């Protein structure tokens, strides 16, 4: 039986980040891997929002104005820089700001970002059985990513999605 996953609509996501154009993620082709000055973890890297609401600030302290309030726990963000307890993050549409590290968690999630809907397959192969469809804007829990496919979960539904259909993983990144 095929499932259709309903979730965040594009309109809800854009309500959070309206007015900001999408920015391609091409500025990170570096020869040497940068690491965070506080954690020693690679930069850039992806994490998820721990709980909602989560405040995105103009700078790395509570003294800086809240620029946006993000309402979706689990949404992937890309950490670009670290300053003390603060992380400079980028959202799927290119919007940047600072978040306290307590608002972030290392669990990986992916945002369906393809035109239309993403197809979840039973195997990491486009010819395998379709197990579900996920609308644009749905947040999927990433379990592993191979060179072209990521194994994901949404509730009890599990499958493989093409990396071309999601945002939240570097081009050459693999993990289990």
Tell me the role of every PLM-derived stretch.
Residues 64-65, 125-128:
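Short, solvent-exposed loop/turn positions at domain surfaces
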Residues 1-5:
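Positively charged n-region of N-terminal signal peptides that target proteins for export
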Residues 7-22:
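Bacterial N-terminal signal peptides
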Residues 27-58, 69-73, 80-83, 87-95, ...:
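SH3-family beta-barrel domains
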Residues 6-7, 43:
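Low-complexity, intrinsically disordered regions enriched in charged/polar residues
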């Amino acid at each position: 039986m095929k499932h259709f996953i309903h979730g965040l609509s594009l309109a809800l996501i854009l309500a959070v980040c309206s007015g900001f154009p999408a920015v391609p993620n091409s500025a990170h082709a570096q020869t040497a891997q940068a690491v965070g000055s506080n954690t020693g973890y690679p930069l850039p890297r992806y994490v998820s929002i721990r709980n909602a609401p989560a405040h995105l600030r103009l700078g790395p302290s509570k003294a800086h104005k809240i620029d946006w309030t993000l309402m979706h726990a689990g949404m992937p963000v890309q950490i670009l820089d670290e300053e003390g307890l603060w992380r400079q993050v980028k959202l799927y549409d290119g919007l940047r700001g600072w978040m306290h590290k307590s608002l972030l968690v290392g669990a990986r999630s992916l945002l369906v970002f393809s035109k239309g809907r993403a197809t979840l397959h039973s195997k990491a192969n486009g010819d395998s059985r379709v197990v579900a469809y996920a609308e644009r804007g749905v947040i999927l829990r990433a379990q592993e990513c191979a060179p072209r496919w990521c194994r994901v979960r949404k509730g009890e539904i599990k499958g493989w999605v093409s990396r071309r259909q999601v945002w939240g993983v570097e081009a050459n990144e693999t993990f289990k």
